[in-house]
Amino acid sequence: MNSSETTICALASGVCKGGIGVVRVSGPLCKVIAKKMLGFVPKPRYAHYGLFFDQENDEIDKGIALFFPKPHSFTGEDILEFQGHGGMSVMCCLLESVISMGAKPADPGEFSKRAFLNGKMNLVQAEAVADMINANSKRASKSAFRSLSGEFSNQVNALTKSIVELRVFVEATIDFSDEEIDFLQFEQVKLKAKGIKQAVETILKSATQGVILREGLNVVIAGKPNAGKSSLLNALTQESSAIVTDIAGTTRDVLKETICVNGMPLNIIDTAGLHDSDDKIEKEGIKRAHFEIERADVVLMVFDAQDDKPDFSILPKNIDDQPLLLIKNKVDLISGAVKKEMINNIVQLSISAKHSKGMELLRKELSDIAGLEDFSEGVVLSRKRHIIALEESLASIDNAIMQLENGVVELMAEDLRFAGQFMGSITGEFSSDDLLGEIFSSFCIGK
């Protein structure tokens, strides 16, 4: 059945006990349900206080009812809301009554999906609804609100328009190549294409920061057994997240904690000590450690200050492109000072995790790697799919410039078409049903 023909309902206030609970209904049966449960259809956008009735006309609760007629509602459909006492028993009775009158339980994100399909918001704004709910810092929530307000969408739409306009012009040169029309010269076309490329690169940089702001920077602590990795995790999180003993190999699995530095989430991941082992459990822990190291945004290579230097042979071989910080731990044992220095073009921090010395120095270094100092107030929360689309669009624009330089105008127009499609996929202008299903299935029910 088409979504516009069905009526959906959900507990919009979440599955928890509270002072107030909200049941949200959207679809063509809203007026019918209102007449049965209230005895009348509420005046649009006015709060009505009264009794709620079930299918048998028995009283369920007393509260506030709101009616938003289409198209002036969140979903673009008729919307009815019941705001009652937040006990789960009361809310379940309200939901059961609404369902008995023809509504069906909403799927995760179905309200937002209908809002998107009915043109009430684009895909970026729909995603921002979920990001507002899941934001884990003040900075993240502010950035999500900017996306919800259309800031990111407007940037993408402006670029998409520029790409389309350039493609239309290039195609016109193909269609009317034999006629005397005053077209821009070669260098002007190239200049415009490079201007678009530069604009995409700027948005890509901001979006990359937005992904970090949304998902956090994955920081993996690696090193030999008893190097002080777990002590470092505890010092960074300021909690006893990991067991610390003098026995080497205490940590055999992966431990994960999230902290915030200046509003930026950092996912700190402690791993098993890296060394040769015949122990089956230790070997599995080392295997998992290698997996985390290979997918890390930054690796903290921890080694004992009593050793001459870190042993890089214990690290996986294919991490050359990943940021690496050398952490010279236990400097208190050699009467060393907390400091930062460069060792073979790699930053090395001398610290004492046990005594929490040098933690501010480490937090500052992690902030720099994440680009925190470069974060402007204009950064919006982004997703990895946005990054992929921007990178694909950028590659297509590069190809278009190359085709122009080679004099193959037809292929330039085709590459510009691809660039526009990749950009359009961000806001949902060009999106498959599979993509929409994947995006909205991650939402909570009632949104």
Swiss-Prot record:
Q: Which residues bind (6S)-5-formyl-5,6,7,8-tetrahydrofolate?
A: 24, 81, 120, 447
- Where this protein primarily resides, as one coarse class? cytoplasm
CDD domains registered for this protein in UniProt: trmE (cd04164), TrmE_N (cd14858)
Query: Which residues does K(+) bind?
Result: 226, 245, 247, 250
Has UniProt tagged this entry with the keyword Magnesium? yes
- Cofactors: K(+)
Provide an example Pfam family for this protein. MMR_HSR1
Q: Which Gene3D superfamilies match?
A: P-loop containing nucleotide triphosphate hydrolases (3.40.50.300), Probable tRNA modification gtpase trme, domain 1 (3.30.1360.120), tRNA modification GTPase MnmE domain 2 (1.20.120.430)
What functional role does this protein have? Exhibits a very high intrinsic GTPase hydrolysis rate. Involved in the addition of a carboxymethylaminomethyl (cmnm) group at the wobble position (U34) of certain tRNAs, forming tRNA-cmnm(5)s(2)U34.
Q: What is this protein called?
A: tRNA modification GTPase MnmE
Gene name, per UniProt, is mnmE
